[in-house]
Amino acid sequence: MDPNTVSSFQDILMRMSKMQLGSSSEDLNGMITQFESLKLYRDSLGEAVMRMGDLHSLQNRNGKWREQLGQKFEEIRWLIEEVRHRLKITENSFEQITFMQALQLLLEVEKEIRTFSFQLI
């Protein structure tokens, strides 16, 4: 896994956890949880690709991995839309920078997950 992506995830999660968005703090906590889940999923796919030929192990561990992959892409799309919405409504420059970086990271991770999944198919 790219060390820059790891530090980007950690940096964005740390900054998002410090943000105070008033009544929408539950939504933000949900976004943080989904970011963490997405990172773990991306890492596990990356590890499977690194071990090439580990497709059978992945399928045995999770017989519905294609369905799970589709769900992760739906989560990514939802997160992208949510981050874009937050970016439009916030006036705080710290939050704008954080959400812009989160959006960039989501697009990068979506591309990486697509690449990993094509290698596993």
Curated annotation (Swiss-Prot):
GO terms for cellular component: host cell nucleus; virion component. GO terms for biological process: exit of virus from host cell nucleus through nuclear pore. Keywords: Host nucleus, Host-virus interaction, Transport, Virion. Coiled coil: none annotated. A motif (Nuclear export signal) lies at residues 12-21, 85-94. Pfam families: Flu_NS2. Its main location: virion. Belongs to the influenza viruses NEP family. Average number present in a viral particle is estimated to be 130-200 molecules. This is Nuclear export protein. It comes from Influenza A virus (strain A/USA:Phila/1935 H1N1). The gene is NS.
